Every structure is written in C-alpha cells, then in structure tokens.
Amino acid sequence: MSKISNSGNESKNTLYCSFCGKSQHEVRKLIAGPTVFICDECVELCMDIIREENKSSGVKVRDGVPTPQEIIAVLDDYVIGQQHAKRVLSVAVHNHYKRLAHQSKSNDIELAKSNILLVGPTGCGKTYLAQTLARIIDVPFTMADATTLTEAGYVGEDVENIILKLLQAADYNVERAQRGIVYIDEVDKISRKADNPSITRDVSGEGVQQALLKIMEGTIASVPPQGGRKHPQQEFLQVDTTNILFICGGAFAGLERIISGRGEKTSIGFSATVKAPDERCVGEIFRDLEPEDLIKFGLIPEFIGRLPIVATLEDLDVNALMQILSQPKNALVKQYQRLFEMENVELAFHEDALRAIAKKAIERKTGARGLRSIMEKILLETMFELPALEGVQKVVISSDVVDEKARPLYIYSERAEDKENVSA
C-alpha cells in the first residue's frame, strides 16, 4: 500500500511543459516561470520561428540602413532586367533610411526627400517592382491607384485615403506611418485632358494632381481614425507627410510620339520635309524624356517639380520574357509546376515552348503581364483532365502545344501501362 501512495505523490510532484504537455522526465530541461513551465524543445521551436521571420524580411540591415547593393540583390531574385530602375529605387530607399536616421541625430541641415517617377511601357514591371519592394523593406509601405482618386467633395476617393492606407499598414502607429513609402500607380491616367487649361472642371485629372501636390511636398493630413467618410464631429489623426517618400508609376501611352516629334516644325506643300517614322522601341524613346514632354502629355509643371527623379524602364524582349517565365523565385513556370506537383505529376517545358510563349506576349503587346493568360490557355485542358486520369507521371509542353498544333505529351508510369495491358 505504501508503494501506491509513493507513486501517487510522485505523479503529483511531476512537472509538465505548459505548451507541449511533456513531463520533466521526457525533456532535457524544464524552465519555470511564475505560473507556467516551458521545456527546451519548445524554446528551440520558438527560436526557429523567430529566425525564419528574420530571414523572410529579405534585406540585411547594417547599422539600421540597408545598402543599395543589399536592396538590389533582393530585387534581382524576383525581377528580371530593368537594372537602371532597380538602381534608382534602391538608392532612393537607402537615402530614405539615411534621411530618417539623420533627422533623429541632428537638426543642423535639413535633408529634403526626392520623390520618384517610373515611366515605362505596359507590362515592363513598374508595379511588380513596387510590390517586391514592399516585401523587403521594414518601413510601412502602401500602394494606391490614381484612377480611383478624385478631388475632395466628389464621388471617389480623396487623396487623404492614400495616407489612411499607409496608416493601416503601420497598424495606426502615426510615427511609423510618417516614415513610410507610398507607391501611386497609373499616375498617367490623371493627366490633364487637354494641353491647355480647360474652363470646365477636371475632377479626376488636373484636380487630382493639384490635390496631390501638398501631400507629396509635405503637409499635415487629417485622416479619419478608422477610415470611412469624414464627419464634422469626428476626431482626426494628424499625419505629417514631410518624410513620406512618394514613388509614382505609369505607362504614359502616346508619350513616345510627343518625344519623337519634339522640335518638329509642321509644313505643307511639295517642299515639305518628310520624316521617316521613329522605329525605335518605346523603352528606347523614353530615354530621351524631358520634363517638357510630360507637361505636353498633361502633367502640370508643379506636379512634375515634386518628382525630381525620373527613371525610365525598357521594353522586355524575348530573352527577358523567357527568363521571367523560369528564373525568379516565384516564376510562372515554378508556380504551375507546384500546382501539378499537388497531383503528383511533373510538368516540363521545352525551351522552344518558352520562346513561343514569350513571342506571343510580345505580339499581344502586353509584356510580362500577358504571360499568365497565355499559360492558362495552354494548360487549361490539361488541368481539367489531370485529376480524373490515373498513372500520369509527367506532362511535357512543346512549342507545337503553344501554337495549338499539338496536345501536351502525357507520360504514364509503368504500373498504369501494365494495368491497361491487363484490362485489354
């Protein structure tokens, strides 16, 4: 009977980990807190989670400021080509960090920010660069669409909504939001509707440019605490936009014609000079961009003045699109291969198939943005049939499949072939 009572006392005195439930005899170490215990295995698991989160932040920070080389190295993992634009962005973000660090130490010289304008043809990676940048920096980052903005008082979003989104990205921490970065996409869509100022009100064009001037330069923006419409009785959060870095991007369709025709004099008659059309690609023409071209396009001079750095992006050729399909960490080919892996099937693309897909995207003039729709069309029937098929081990895509001259090649496992022979 004494043995039973001793074992009962032992079980009462045994300590257990509050997280995994293991006893002190099953682990090497049990650490005691005020009311809880944690074992060495759970501590190690917590450390692994923290290490993984630190890795996913992407940019290694040295003395609090990531170098341009460190930023561009991470961008290179996701974005193919566009080295000039990546250099501009990495230097701008690096200087943004430095400016914030400088302000906390000294007030003798005020460092002004240099907002950026990204100009490039559609599908060349402007928006994707900004999205990738958002993943790798540790300051609040938000993206806004200029096409949804209108002047205050009209149906649509006010420009203050951009600051509200940044505030939400900072978990309503005003101090962190004031150190953030804003990317405004489709900024070419808010250009003035005519070269000359109009008598009628342009609430979604020039009016939005006028409204953006102050927040881009620096002002105290009044933002509703939890979003929604402004009410007179509502208390607002005051956000200083002086240190917020603004990056704007747009395709500027038709701007190449303005650049090519710059300085031309119109003449008629038999003695008129006939100039051959500019055969350069859009990206090459954009390299000759001047502020006066943007003014002629429809941006007001004050708005252009708030964007001192202009970075032009290049057209993507066949080789660049082939690399985009297969090389980046989240390349389209890798994404579809992962989808097929879930069906225990290997997906393979011939090099000529990737070239044919790239050529189709160039013919459609959609750039990298059009690659997914082409891939979906190629693989639609296969993705429909595959879950119902047994024994498919590999699917091979050739250039004939892309050109709709053949079906994808299905390679079956030996077991599936044996079953077919037996049933026959």
UniProtKB/Swiss-Prot annotation:
Residues 5-58 form the ClpX-type ZB domain. The keyword Nucleotide-binding applies. The keyword Iron does not apply. ATP binds at P121, T122, G123, C124, G125, K126, T127, Y128. InterPro entries: AAA+_ATPase (IPR003593), ATP-dep_Clp_protease_ClpX (IPR050052), ATPase_AAA_core (IPR003959), Clp_ATPase_C (IPR019489), Clp_protease_ATP-bd_su_ClpX (IPR004487), ClpX_bact (IPR046425), P-loop_NTPase (IPR027417), Znf_CppX_C4 (IPR010603). SMART domains: AAA (SM00382), ClpB_D2-small (SM01086), zf-C4_ClpX (SM00994). GO terms for biological process: cell division; proteolysis involved in protein catabolic process. Zn(2+) binds at C17, C20, C39, C42. Pfam families: AAA_2, ClpB_D2-small, zf-C4_ClpX. Keywords: ATP-binding, Chaperone, Metal-binding, Nucleotide-binding, Zinc. It comes from the Bacteria. CDD domains: RecA-like_ClpX. Component of the ClpX-ClpP complex. Forms a hexameric ring that, in the presence of ATP, binds to fourteen ClpP subunits assembled into a disk-like structure with a central cavity, resembling the structure of eukaryotic proteasomes. ATP-dependent specificity component of the Clp protease. It directs the protease to specific substrates. Can perform chaperone functions in the absence of ClpP. This is ATP-dependent Clp protease ATP-binding subunit ClpX. It comes from Bartonella tribocorum (strain CIP 105476 / IBS 506). The lineage of its organism: Bacteria, Pseudomonadati, Pseudomonadota, Alphaproteobacteria, Hyphomicrobiales.
